[in-house]
């Protein structure tokens, strides 16, 4: 669909796509937005530069030494940053593009490699009228049940997927489930099986064989 942005393979590998990131940091407005996001999420990154000869991105970190009030700086290969930081930078491009154009972002496992508080912050950006004046939408799948929060989502914004005995998957909105009020603890109800959609785990039936393999 028009103005729909999907998570691509490069982000699934947590690697910012070279050409897209280079274009982003060469655009003053986009780079400012990216650095503001990295600052707000406590990454410690104050700048991102691209070495055209080596074709390597470097992140800049500033710090104060113990015996000096002056700040020192160091540069780190972007691939040496945490997986969460790399993924945040990789996702920022489609986030910014959708916020500017008012499109829809579709991401599988939004929370992968991200701290839960960071994931919540990204969601709140899309909920903010100030940051999202063009009504961009974020659609994502997650395994983080803490995001099932009435302060983040209405009942009609949360969906459960469930496999039946034949392996087919169905999807249902919490608003369609009888007895689900807007003031209930959604995460607690989900984890105790009230909504369905939880895996059937046969923990007592699993027995690990500690014998050494036969050579």
Tell where the protein language model's regions lie, with residue ranges.
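Phosphate-coordinating catalytic segments in nucleotide- and nucleic-acid-processing enzymes
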Residues: 1-92, 100, 195-197, 207-210, ...
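Switch/communication elements of ASCE P-loop NTPase nucleotide-binding domains
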Residues: 58-189, 193-198
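Long, compositionally biased
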Residues: 203-205
């Amino acid at each position: 669909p028009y103005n729909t942005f999907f998570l691509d393979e490069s982000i699934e590998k947590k690697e910012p796509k070279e050409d897209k990131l280079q274009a982003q940091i060469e655009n003053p407005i986009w780079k400012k937005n990216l650095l503001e996001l990295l600052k707000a999420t406590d990454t410690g990154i104050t700048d991102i530069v691209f070495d055209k000869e080596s074709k390597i991105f470097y992140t800049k970190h500033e710090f104060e030494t113990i015996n000096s009030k002056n700040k020192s700086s160091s540069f780190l290969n972007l691939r040496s940053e945490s997986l969460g930081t790399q993924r945040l930078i990789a996702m920022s491009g489609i986030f910014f593009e959708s916020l500017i154009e008012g499109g829809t972002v579709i991401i599988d496992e939004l929370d992968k490699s991200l701290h839960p508080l960071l994931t919540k912050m990204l969601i709140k950006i899309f909920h903010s009228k100030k940051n999202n004046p063009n009504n961009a939408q974020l659609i994502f799948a997650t395994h983080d049940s803490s995001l099932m929060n009435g302060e983040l989502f209405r009942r009609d914004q949360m969906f459960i997927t469930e496999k039946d005995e034949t392996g087919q998957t169905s999807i249902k909105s919490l608003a369609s489930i009888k007895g689900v009020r807007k003031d209930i603890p959604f995460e607690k109800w989900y984890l105790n099986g009230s909504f369905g959609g939880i895996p059937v785990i046969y923990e007592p039936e699993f027995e690990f064989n500690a014998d050494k393999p036969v050579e």
